[in-house]
Regions:
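The serine-hydrolase catalytic nucleophile loop
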Residues: 457-470, 625-626
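Beta-strand C-termini and the immediately following turn/loop, strongest in propeller blades
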Residues: 89, 94, 99-106, 115, ...
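Short amphipathic alpha-helix adjacent to the substrate-entry channel of hydrolases
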Residues: 464-483
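Beta-strand-rich domains and repeat architectures in extracellular enzymes and scaffolds
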Residues: 73-112, 135
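Short beta-strand element of the alpha/beta-hydrolase
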Residues: 445-455
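Multi-bladed beta-propeller domains
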Residues: 53-86, 114-130, 160-176, 196-198, ...
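N-terminal cap/lid segment of alpha/beta-hydrolase-fold proteins
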Residues: 404-443
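Active-site-proximal cap/loop segments of hydrolase catalytic domains
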Residues: 475, 482-676
Length: 676
């Protein structure tokens, strides 16, 4: 599955030769390919160690409270579902016909190069922490990549020299740094950093060849909401997006020499979202996405001098999800999110005619990037039948090629279930949709259901690879349903606003309506339903349990918000104001009272069914204290609760050893509480 992510999604644009780099944090631009239920446990590694009593032994970074032993037999049954990996397209090499990808052979994703479709992957980095994204420095084969430590999201930027393999830290090693854009000749790189105050995201410019002498601040920001998306061809101007909320963002032109800002996006009485942009080679136009005068995001070309906007994708009833402009400016590629799956399109900019492309398998497409000669289009494709892999299409011959073929643990991926789009009416007559994965027909009778709610809240569950979750379908006969409740993206900007402010709990009522729908389905067992979700989906899980405790068997909350006030007061300062725009300002007495009232912590006494709460100690978004106060409240009320804390993780688990144990513990939780 795939989850869109907040303000950063508005900046999703890729430069001509790279699919893995943009103005927002690198890892956030490629949406998660698995639901947070199991936190993307998707790559090969041996099973966790087993004790003498045949129980799986957690590693030293995990703290367990209330969890029973996970038996060896359960781990052995699940082995094949853990032994697979994914790969993501990052960029085309400017000098050689090869791809840069991220994949994982050990514990965390690293950089690899691939020289041809199906060729061997050559590993380039060997860190104990994850690589989040990368791109080539123009005109060279040197790579700039992003990395953090322990999931803390204090991203640092590094330069890897192609000739020597030497890696140089470009940033200060302490602040949060988000990769931006290179000038056309590769001399200059602009990026956003909190190094000045630790909170405000300022725009900086450096020459990566000599960062110590050239690094300087260009724009003093306020909060972490400025993202550089491109340089003008003459390297005198930066195109910058200011993200305010998922519904509102602005574009600015910034003079590199003086730092002077000129608004580029037009003033509007309504809230308008503008995505990242890309200058045409002559600097006379900017290609971008916007929902100005539209319910959905469209691909447009804006004249720099006159601000006249030319809509390139008229008549769409879906969002343009991402796009890429070739280096020479002759070709555009874009994806359209059609009911949770993406279609791929390309255009000859000179004629404005679409380029015929082969049909891409049903799923999600991300990280678009043109090869230097503007012939091959690289991207990451995820489908129900395949993990994320790097693909390319030759726009001259129409040949679609798969550059990586990630392993699936020896399982027959063609047998994995495809999603079915389902819909139901909510309390106010609004139609809510979701994706339902059914177990094989060999499982007789009404089936148990896991309801998995995405994060965001401005996100969407899209068709993709279920990964480990296929175990629930194929081995346990459990159906999985992913609702896109109100507030989700992908269904128009009006739908996104339906849960704002005091309407927050209307999205929880959508879950109640879903329970009514499940009860009316002969193939589903209304008496055996579990709810789960991560981040905002974790809040939804806790809220659903306080409202519908009697209708759920159990629940799994992953890095979820338990109290809106304490969350807003303790989320990292660089993101606090952005979250207040979405959820409300807790400093206002009336809003504070409302947020306290709807917080799951205030109604924890209503939760009597088994709960499993999972958290990363280094989470900068949802502090670990949100989990611990909820665990404490449930215990105080005599409720059954399991608690798993990872001391070396942040907002979700990224290390394979931790993912392994979480998956196995989740299986134990499901068998003990949903299936019995």
């Amino acid at each position: 599955m795939k989850i869109s992510l907040k303000v950063e999604e508005a900046m999703r644009v890729n430069h001509g030769t790279g699919g893995g780099w943009a103005a927002a944090p690198l890892h956030l631009l490629r949406k998660s390919s698995l639901p947070l239920l199991l936190l993307s446990s998707i790559f090969f590694s041996p099973l966790p160690a087993r004790g003498a009593d045949d129980a799986v032994v957690p590693n030293e970074a995990l703290v367990l409270d209330g969890l029973p032993a996970v038996p060896k037999a359960l781990a052995e049954r699940a082995t094949a579902y853990m032994e697979f990996r994914t790969a993501s397209f990052q960029a085309w090499n400017p000098l050689r016909p090869e791809m840069l990808v991220t994949t994982r052979f050990g514990d965390v994703p690293q950089l690899h190069r691939v020289k041809a479709p199906g060729a061997a992957r050559t590993q380039l980095t060997f860190y104990s922490e994850r690589i989040l994204g990368a791109r080539y420095r123009p005109k060279t084969a040197d790579i700039v990549f992003s990395k953090d430590v322990g999931g803390g999201e204090w991203f640092q930027l590094y330069l890897r020299e192609d000739r020597t393999g030497k890696v140089t830290l470009l940033t200060d090693g302490r602040s949060r740094n988000q990769g931006g854009a290179f000038s056309r000749d590769g001399t200059w790189m602009a990026y956003t950093s909190t190094k000045r105050t630790g909170k405000n995201g300022d725009i900086w410019v450096m020459n990566p060849s000599d960062p110590a002498k050239t690094d300087r601040m260009v724009v003093e920001g306020s909060g972490e909401n400025l993202f550089v998306t491109d340089w003008s061809p003459d390297a005198k101007t930066l195109l910058v997006v200011e993200g305010i909320s998922v519904n509102e963002s602005r574009q600015w032109l910034v003079d590199v020499a003086s730092g002077a800002k000129t608004r580029f996006s037009p003033e509007s009485k309504e809230l308008v979202s503008w995505g990242g942009g890309r200058f045409s080679p002559d600097g006379k136009a900017v290609y971008t996405t916007t929902d100005l005068d539209s319910e959905f995001k469209r691909l447009v070309a804006v004249d720099v001098a006159t601000k006249k906007m030319d809509v390139l994708t008229p008549g769409l009833a879906w969002d343009v999800q991402g796009f890429a402009l070739s280096e020479d400016g002759t070709k555009l590629a874009w994806t359209v999110n059609e009911a949770g799956a993406e279609t791929l399109h390309a255009m000859d900019v000179r004629t404005r005619k679409e380029i015929p492309l082969p049909k891409v398998p049903y799923g999600t497409i991300g990280g678009l990037g043109w090869s230097p000669e503007a012939r091959n289009l690289g991207f990451t494709l995820t489908s129900a039948k395949s993990p994320a892999d790097a693909w390319a299409v030759d726009t001259q011959t129409g040949v679609l090629s798969r550059w990586t073929e990630s392993e699936t643990g020896g399982l027959d991926a063609n047998a994995f279930a495809e999603p079915e789009i389902v819909s139901w009416k909510s309390f106010d007559g609004k139609t809510i949709t979701g994706l339902l994965y059914r177990p094989p027909a060999s499982f007789a009778g009404p089936r148990p259901v896991i309801v998995n709610i995405h994060g965001g809240p401005e996100g969407q569950t899209q068709a993709g690879f279920l990964g480990r979750n296929n175990f629930f379908l194929n081995e346990l006969g459990v159906a999985i349903l992913y609702p896109n409740v109100r507030g989700s993206t992908g269904y128009g900007k009006t739908f996104v606003k339906l849960d704002n402010g005091v309407l927050r709990e209307d999205s929880v009522k959508d879950v109640g309506a879903l329970l009514d729908w499940i009860a009316a389905q002969p193939s589903l067992d209304k008496s055996r339903v579990m709810v789960t979700g991560g981040s905002y989906g974790g809040y939804m899980t806790l809220a659903a349990m306080t409202h519908y405790n009697d209708r759920f068997r159990c629940a799994l909350d992953v890095v979820g918000i338990s109290n809106w006030v304490t969350f807003l007061e303790h989320t990292e300062s660089y993101r606090r104001d952005l979250r207040r725009v979405e959820y409300g300002d807790e400093r206002d007495p009336k809003m504070r009272a409302f947020l306290e009232r709807i917080s799951p912590l205030a109604s924890a006494s209503k939760i009597t069914k088994p709960m499993f709460i999972v958290q990363g100690k280094n989470d900068p978004r949802v502090p670990y204290t949100e989990a611990e106060q909820m665990v404490g409240a449930i215990k105080k009320n005599g409720g059954p609760v399991w608690y798993l804390l990872a001391k070396d993780e942040g907002h979700g688990f990224s290390k394979k050893k931790n993912q392994d144990f979480l998956f196995l513990a989740t299986l134990k939780f499901v068998e003990d509480n949903l299936l019995k």
